Amino acid sequence: MIKNRVIFISILFLISAQNKLPAQNRSEKKIIEFGWDYPNVSFLKANITNMEKAPFDGVVFSFDFDIYNAFDTTQRPDFQFQYKDLSEIQWKKFTDNFLFVRGASISGAHWLDDNSWVKIVQNLKKVSKVLAVSKAEGIGFDPEYYYPDSTLNPWIYRASWYNNLSYQEVGRYVKKRGKQFIQALQTNKPDIKILCFWLLGLIEMQSQSQPVSETGMALYPFFVEGMLEGQNKLSEIIDGNEFSYGYQNPIGFIEAGNYRRENGSKFIKESLQPKFKKVSLAQAIFFDLIYAKSPEYEKGFDKQTKERWLRDNLYSAFKTTDKYVWFYNERINWWKGEVDSGVAKIITDVKNTINAQQNNRSNQINGNSLLLNFKENKPDNYQGFYYSYTKNTNALRIKLLDKDIISIQVYNNSRLIYNLTDPSVNFSIDLNKKYNKKGNLIILAKSSNGKSTVAYVN
């Protein structure tokens, strides 16, 4: 999935993590913990003070009875939604929390059954009340199907399962349900955030080897279309970009937003593509992969190299996300203290560096790009370009140090805002039309010899 390229990162990465800032100057970027150690409501209520000692800004949690299945028709009594317990949780440091919801049901999604969807919508309205009562930001939505009975997979299309209706005919039902889904969730939480761990990246990957209608996520694009149609002006759909689990360089993080939106829009009808391209992007860190917590993840890296990989990925994830980084783990448990030594400090140090850079009050920021590869102990002397950014005029000046550079791209968080080919050795960009001085500025240069040069400006 990821090409082997030589990568260059801005020297600003090397700013000391000792630049700690008071709480009021924290970055708007947030890191959310999610994993097999997800807490239930009762655990949260009893342990929130200790939990908030972990280096996160929020957590993905579940009800006591189980992970909530989005298409569940079970008519549960109100007490199972734990409104009272949720209202009594004393959140302080954890400001951005999400209820774990799976895109599944033990009896299927009932796409064609209006009566079942009356029950599903009633339940989702209760979930919406849960979000309002708990002051959670929204749901962490996992559309992957994990169960052995494939006939209950809501996203697979087989004509024989749907009264021999065509793919498009079933899709119209699924689209209707996606609209009902988000509208029900907006009932009590109009500003809900739906963090989709996968949006359309998974079907994008599956469709490379087979027709879309035959993939394991065949019906999911219709559901996403429905969400887009039912979305109000306050709610937000977030692409969790699970692809970022395995990135080994910053290019994947930088290009992900543009790539996900452009390629994902191919699965969305034309009239909804502009709205789809407004979807925000999150970035993921898969701790178990980086630290090789299972044999299949082993790459032969020593402890120091794994630590550099984690640090570099966290840094790039923070710089390129629109708001959220989700830290996923399976074989550690933050809430029982079963975490590798030094990991919490790495997260804290990266957050402090991000905060210091985000709150840099200097009017002018200058830097050179240099080689920084987590597999190496120290940066190379290579310099791709020099840049100077002036805040009050919102002007970016670039001088190429590598004459083989053939393209320059400028990003604001996950969004590509400028794309220049065959740039001059010295040039300036007036950013006023496309950059409102919020979020991070990133410069990506590519050369004719295959090198990619990166600078994180702020």
Report the location of each language-model feature.
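Glycan-processing catalytic domains of CAZymes
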Residues: Q24-G367
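Surface-exposed, short loops/turns at beta-strand junctions within beta-sandwich domains
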Residues: L431-K438
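Conserved structural position at the C-terminal beta-strand
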Residues: A445-S447
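Edge beta-strands of extracellular beta-sandwich domains
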Residues: K451-N458
